[in-house]
Amino acid sequence: MPIDRERILSLFGEIQKALSILKEFQKEKKEKIIGDLKVLGSVKYYFIVVMEGCIDICHHILSREQWGVPESYADGFVLLGEKKIIPIKLAQNLANMAKFRNLLVHLYWKVDDERLY
């Protein structure tokens, strides 16, 4: 099956919305972000939204191209890099972000909130 361009564009739109919100938070001082649980929770949520969109795009491409099922979200980005769909450096950055996303979602009590800023 061909790649669903509309689905990819829709996911990119959601990623862009979440990134624009994160950029607004970036203007705030670190103390405000880290010190306010509501703000910190919003930052974490929008980071997860960005990563979920990236992961969905990644898995859609891997599935449609029949390149197999990666063992982890991070491995999916590495595979896209190996297939030259995205630059290797971007693949590595996205893989690291996917690992951080997993930490946020599954081991949230271990997250160093300073890393979010």
Q: Model-predicted segments: where are they?
A:
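Solvent-exposed interaction patches of small proteins and small membrane subunits
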Residues: 1-117
